[in-house]
Amino acid sequence: MASLLNARTAVITGGAQGLGLAIGQRFVAEGARVVLGDVNLEATEVAAKRLGGDDVALAVRCDVTQADDVDILIRTAVERFGGLDVMVNNAGITRDATMRTMTEEQFDQVIAVHLKGTWNGTRLAAAIMRERKRGAIVNMSSVSGKVGMVGQTNYSAAKAGIVGMTKAAAKELAHLGIRVNAIAPGLIRSAMTEAMPQRIWDQKLAEVPMGRAGEPSEVASVAVFLASDLSSYMTGTVLDVTGGRFI
């Protein structure tokens, strides 16, 4: 059976760890070449080596809030691997606090990384993809953008905004052969979630009908689906990867 992403080139932001790294691993396993972007260059270089080194994975320092950084990231893929087939806008941060205690800076930081960062990645990737009349853009939203979470007015707003942006961009780009879809993960096992107090973890887990947290690899599988021709007639969709939480 042929690999789903054979000879395709993908750019993944937030690629040094977590979901971004898991997506990179799965993409390479499916035959893709990847360029990982992250603000932590050292960690990104380590991740690229884990994926197989320069022949299949490159590391670039990228602050997604800066359009010039994103442009360099994408152009690295074009120059080193000959094109851009898939863009995964995954970079993210959290600055959780109630509205009473959240600072304006904390709000702005989260909006800038998630929402502006995704906009930068989507528009700059589309500028390259339109030349070939094909491409797949995958944006990382969250269940938090669907239902809202206490202490996450910034994060929930940003993730909901990504849904609206995905749908608007899908309509703008469909005639160019560019598909734009989003993933909305729920409770996914990671260093961040495993650091939660046990009481909070148990509360969140109780909301999941499947009775367990998801694994990063399970989100990566959905990213492969949206990046590949398996989803060739899908654009503007948001796929929940939540184990049934908040259905």
From Swiss-Prot:
Query: Which positions does UniProt annotate for NAD(+) binding?
Result: L19, D38, D63, V64, Y155, K159, S190
Binding positions (substrate): S142
Top-level taxon in the UniProt lineage: Bacteria
Q: Which InterPro entries match?
A: NAD(P)-bd_dom_sf, Sc_DH/Rdtase_CS, SDR_fam
Q: Name one GO biological process term.
A: fatty acid elongation
**Swiss-Prot/TrEMBL keywords:** NAD, Oxidoreductase
Q: Listed GO molecular functions?
A: oxidoreductase activity, acting on the CH-OH group of donors, NAD or NADP as acceptor
Concerning Pfam families, the annotation shows: adh_short_C2
Instruction: Name the active site residues.
Output: Y155
Q: Which NCBIfam families match?
A: PRK05653.1-3, PRK07231.1, PRK12826.1-2
What protein is this chain from? Uncharacterized oxidoreductase Mb1385
